[in-house]
From Swiss-Prot:
Belongs to the UPF0741 family. It comes from Bacillus subtilis (strain 168). Pfam families: DUF1450 (PF07293). It comes from the Bacteria. The gene is ywzC. This is UPF0741 protein YwzC. InterPro entries: DUF1450, UPF0741.
Length: 74
């Protein structure tokens, strides 16, 4: 079963232009869905992504990528 990443293209703390390529580096075969995730509160202050239906957030994109690497299915 492939990994799935879901990210918002409207939240202030998430930079889609840099985050998407980094997620693809982590897992090139993952399904990626871009759109509102109804996670607006945390999305204003922290970078976030849903990984396999689990929300992950961190103060910086680098920290978020570290968390994503730990949560993906190998």
């Amino acid at each position: 079963m492939a990994n799935e990443f879901r990210v918002c293209d409207d939240c202030q703390a998430t930079n889609i232009k840099t985050l998407l390529p980094r997620l693809k580096e982590v897992d090139p075969d993952a399904k990626v869905e871009v759109g509102c995730q109804s996670y607006c509160g945390p999305g204003r202050k922290k970078s976030f992504a849903f990984v396999n239906n689990r929300p992950l957030s961190a103060p910086t994109e680098d920290e978020l990528i570290d968390k994503v690497k730990k949560k993906i299915k190998k």
